[in-house]
Swiss-Prot record:
<dbReference type="GO" id="GO:0015937">
    <property type="term" value="P:coenzyme A biosynthetic process"/>
</dbReference>
<dbReference type="Pfam" id="PF01121">
    <property type="entry name" value="CoaE"/>
</dbReference>
<protein>
    <recommendedName>
        <fullName>Dephospho-CoA kinase</fullName>
        <ecNumber>2.7.1.24</ecNumber>
    </recommendedName>
</protein>
<comment type="function">
    <text>Catalyzes the phosphorylation of the 3'-hydroxyl group of dephosphocoenzyme A to form coenzyme A.</text>
</comment>
<dbReference type="InterPro" id="IPR001977">
    <property type="entry name" value="Depp_CoAkinase"/>
</dbReference>
<keyword id="KW-0808">Transferase</keyword>
<comment type="similarity">
    <text>Belongs to the CoaE family.</text>
</comment>
<dbReference type="GO" id="GO:0005737">
    <property type="term" value="C:cytoplasm"/>
</dbReference>
<keyword id="KW-0547">Nucleotide-binding</keyword>
<dbReference type="GO" id="GO:0005524">
    <property type="term" value="F:ATP binding"/>
</dbReference>
<feature type="domain" description="DPCK">
    <location>
        <begin position="4"/>
        <end position="203"/>
    </location>
</feature>
<keyword id="KW-0067">ATP-binding</keyword>
<dbReference type="GO" id="GO:0004140">
    <property type="term" value="F:dephospho-CoA kinase activity"/>
</dbReference>
<keyword id="KW-0173">Coenzyme A biosynthesis</keyword>
<keyword id="KW-0963">Cytoplasm</keyword>
<keyword id="KW-0418">Kinase</keyword>
<comment type="pathway">
    <text>Cofactor biosynthesis; coenzyme A biosynthesis; CoA from (R)-pantothenate: step 5/5.</text>
</comment>
């Protein structure tokens, strides 16, 4: 019977890379970030609700959500984050549920790629939780390089989530991403072999 696995981790922990690798191994990935973008795409009901609640500044000159403005707003005002989540989350859940059911019907194991799985208390909606683990210092380095953030801003983003150590303790399986991409792939393959998703290579001498 196909399984539904919740994949999560800290910000900049390498979760997207793991998702890509899992899709290569035959899993179907349902991406919460992608669903969230779809929920407020240009012309959508979700975006109309965002404009109604947050005003015209929430929409950019192309008629799309002003992500920089909204990102700063919800990061600095937790009550605004709750208002935005109240609009987006129900739409995102519907999009993800529909996609998940379609894949299950076809017999695929499904990865629910959800950055804030524990923060939104969604662990009971999946069969297992896998956490991509890295150190906080690596998270901050990646954020500073990838998002061009100062150390203080990177720290603020890392500490706005449940710590990666706590998430790891709550997980069914932890995927170590303290090394490079090759090591990450090897760690993931080891887990998939142990759990029976892929066969262990046969290093025997043959017939």
């Amino acid at each position: 019977m196909p399984k539904v696995i919740g994949l999560t981790g800290g910000i900049a922990s390498g979760k997207s890379t793991v998702s890509e690798l899992l899709s290569v191994f035959g899993f179907k990935v349902v991406d919460a970030d992608k669903a969230a973008r779809e929920a407020v795409k240009k012309g959508s009901k979700g975006l109309a609700q965002v404009r109604e609640v947050f005003g015209d500044e929430a929409i950019d000159e192309n008629g799309e959500m002003n992500r920089r403005y909204m990102g700063d707003l919800v990061f600095n005002h937790p009550e605004k984050r709750l208002e935005l989540n109240a609009i987006i989350h129900p739409i995102v859940r519907d999009i993800m549920e529909e996609e998940k059911q379609e894949y299950l019907k076809q017999g695929y194991n499904v990865i629910m790629d959800i950055p804030l799985l524990f923060e939104n208390e969604l662990e009971n909606t999946v069969d297992e939780v896998w956490v991509v683990y890295t150190s906080e210092s690596i998270q901050m380095d990646r954020l500073m390089q990838r998002n061009n953030l100062s150390l203080e801003d990177a720290k603020a983003r890392v500490y706005s989530q449940i710590s990666i150590d706590k998430k790891s303790r709550m997980a069914d399986h932890v995927i170590d991403n303290l090394g490079d991409k090759l090591e990450l792939k090897q760690n993931l393959e080891r887990l998939l072999e142990e759990e029976g998703y892929i066969e262990k290579p046969n290093y025997g001498e043959g017939d």
